[in-house]
Design a protein with these regions (language model features):
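Mature catalytic core of soluble alpha/beta enzymes
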Residues: 1-161
Length: 161
């Protein structure tokens, strides 16, 4: 995978830990130099880019997010985002604002975040629950957070005020 190639390259160069932010894809290599986990913010939709809705604590994992707030335009007060339903050609309108996937492989997270968004909350969550070493946070239009079963136990998190 691309993540494995990047990690191999960083290891060859002597990197034991690191943090790489590729927009909606954050890769954490190992733990921080002090041994603690990285705290990765998950953006509050339609807020300033730096405003986090929650933070997840990860070590040697990736956090990948997809959402309607990343790329969109408005016409007559209606937002049109970039995640399109292939059956209609229009943006999905399924009650979701965003999905964040926490997994060991960046390439898995990238595909899963968009797939889970397209599936919607119930089916997307069912898919995540069927996968090993994969957790998720879904944000619905009412700004409610929906967590997969391993969130809080396998992946610590903190909701921001």
């Amino acid at each position: 995978s691309r993540r494995r190639l990047l990690l191999d390259y960083l290891n060859q160069k002597g990197a034991a830990c690191g943090y790489i932010n590729l927009g909606g894809n954050v890769l954490c290599l190992g733990a921080k130099p002090d041994g603690s986990s990285y705290n990765i913010g998950i953006q509050r939709p339609f807020d300033d880019e730096g405003a986090a809705m929650l933070a997840v604590s990860v070590t040697d994992q990736t956090v990948v997010s997809s959402g309607v707030y990343e790329r969109y335009f408005e016409v007559d007060g209606k937002r049109y985002h970039h995640i399109l339903d292939t059956a209609t050609g229009y943006p999905y309108d399924n009650g979701l604002l965003g999905v964040s996937i926490i997994t060991d492989e960046s390439v898995d997270g990238d595909g899963l975040s968009t797939t889970c968004f397209a599936l919607g909350l119930a089916d997307g969550m069912a898919l995540v629950e069927s996968l090993d070493n994969t957790e998720a946070v879904f944000i619905t239009e009412d700004y409610e957070l929906h967590f997969s079963s391993g969130m809080g136990t396998k992946i610590p998190y903190q909701v921001m005020e």
